[in-house]
Design a protein with these regions (language model features):
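Ferredoxin-reductase
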Residues: 1-72
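Gly/Ser/Thr-enriched, mixed-charge loops and adjacent short helices
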Residues: 65-106
């Protein structure tokens, strides 16, 4: 999974927690660094990943931040994002040991 973030102050801490959770669930992470959301989307087509998460508050004030999630090359929405919410709320996480690597895409 590619992980990118914008330059909001909370981005680094959210990235650290996200990467920890993903790798402890057996997911391999490619950290593409501080990039705008369109570059995270670009990475889904040009980096060997099965999805991506951009940490961004988008157009919201700087004190807000969140995740834009993708499966394959498309955005996670509708029933898919509701299923993710259910997994998180129930704590139904897989256990594993994923790896992390950094890849500069710009």
């Amino acid at each position: 999974v590619a992980v990118g973030r914008d330059n909001r102050p909370s981005g680094a801490a959210l990235r650290d927690a996200l990467v920890k959770g993903l790798t402890e669930s057996g997911v391999d992470v490619v950290d593409v660094g501080v990039v705008p959301t369109p570059l995270l989307y670009w990475s889904l087509h040009h980096v060997n990943v099965v999805g991506g998460i951009q940490i961004t508050g988008s157009h919201n004030p700087p004190e807000y931040n969140g995740f834009k999630c993708c499966v394959g090359t498309g955005s996670l929405h509708g029933e898919g994002i509701q299923r993710l919410r259910q997994i998180i709320e129930a704590g139904q996480f897989r256990s594993g040991s994923g790896n992390t690597r950094e890849e500069a895409i710009i």
